């Protein structure tokens, strides 16, 4: 009888210890997510950058992936893609190069269209642009008035979005490597998120499309300055092609050596 009692006491102790340990781990993980979100909020609070020309005076992380003749430069890129089951059907892309040395912003707006029935039938067009007084203007004449208006009215989320609102979602996971300063955020966003609303309105995306978000970048999470980052929005509707919006801000610093 005594042995039987000891057995149940030991079992109860094991269960209690397991609950305490599991609860402690859960609280530790939850606290870590709160801490990382607070750090990301400091980074995202540096946006929006309403005037792109202010980037002339802003430094960021050095990015080693660009050629030596493209230094002291911010690169801003966005793309809107329609993707079928296994192929790209349509993509509009804007790429701007913000040269901190010459105080000039130049780039191009590209459009790509692929025929699903004929893989060899692909249409690609590129339109050179520049930014003057925070407005996108063409460096060559464009005869299509609708396309001209579309490109001239183009804005990046880093200009007009509410990036900190992404952190309000309860369905997010954030990771951060303090040795490299790389971070990653992924999860789902509701249709009430202002960035989701803006993109759906801009690109005529179905209102009921579900939205997944991913944010990658490099930062110490202290919000000291603007950091390299890549932002992805994935819109999915049953029976519809997937729509992907990407936006990135990267920096390459002139070496002092």
Curated annotation (Swiss-Prot):
Give the membrane topology. Answer: Single-pass membrane protein
Sorted keywords for this record are:
Cell membrane, Membrane, Transmembrane, Transmembrane helix
| UniProt source species | Staphylococcus aureus (strain N315)
- A GO term from the CC aspect: plasma membrane
Transmembrane segments annotated in the record for this chain: 6-26
The entry sums up its family as follows: Belongs to the staphylococcal tandem lipoprotein family.
Q: What is this protein called?
A: Uncharacterized protein SA0203
Q: Does the keyword rRNA-binding apply?
A: no
User: What is its subcellular localisation?
Assistant: Cell membrane
């Amino acid at each position: 009888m005594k042995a039987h009692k000891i057995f149940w006491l030991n079992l109860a102790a094991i269960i209690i210890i397991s609950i305490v340990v599991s609860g402690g781990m859960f609280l530790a993980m939850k606290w870590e997510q709160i801490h990382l979100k607070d750090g990301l909020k400091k980074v995202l609070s540096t946006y929006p950058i309403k005037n792109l020309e202010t980037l002339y005076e802003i430094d960021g992380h050095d990015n080693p992936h660009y050629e030596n003749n493209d230094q002291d430069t911010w690169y801003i890129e966005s793309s809107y893609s329609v993707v079928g089951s296994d192929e790209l059907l349509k993509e509009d892309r804007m790429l701007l190069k913000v040269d901190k040395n010459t105080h000039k912003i130049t780039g191009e707006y590209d459009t790509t269209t692929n025929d699903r029935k004929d893989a060899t039938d692909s249409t690609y067009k590129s339109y050179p642009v520049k930014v003057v007084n925070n407005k996108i203007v063409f460096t060559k004449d464009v005869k299509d008035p609708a396309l001209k208006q579309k490109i001239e009215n183009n804005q990046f989320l880093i200009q007009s979005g509410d990036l900190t609102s992404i952190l309000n979602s309860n369905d997010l996971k954030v990771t951060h490597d303090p040795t490299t300063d790389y971070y990653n955020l992924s999860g789902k966003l509701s249709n009430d998120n202002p960035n989701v609303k803006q993109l759906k309105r801009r690109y005529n995306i179905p209102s009921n499309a579900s939205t997944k978000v991913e944010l990658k970048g490099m930062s110490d999470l202290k919000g000291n300055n603007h950091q390299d980052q890549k932002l992805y929005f994935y819109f999915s509707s049953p029976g519809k092609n997937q729509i992907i919006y990407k936006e990135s801000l990267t920096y390459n610093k002139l070496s002092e050596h």
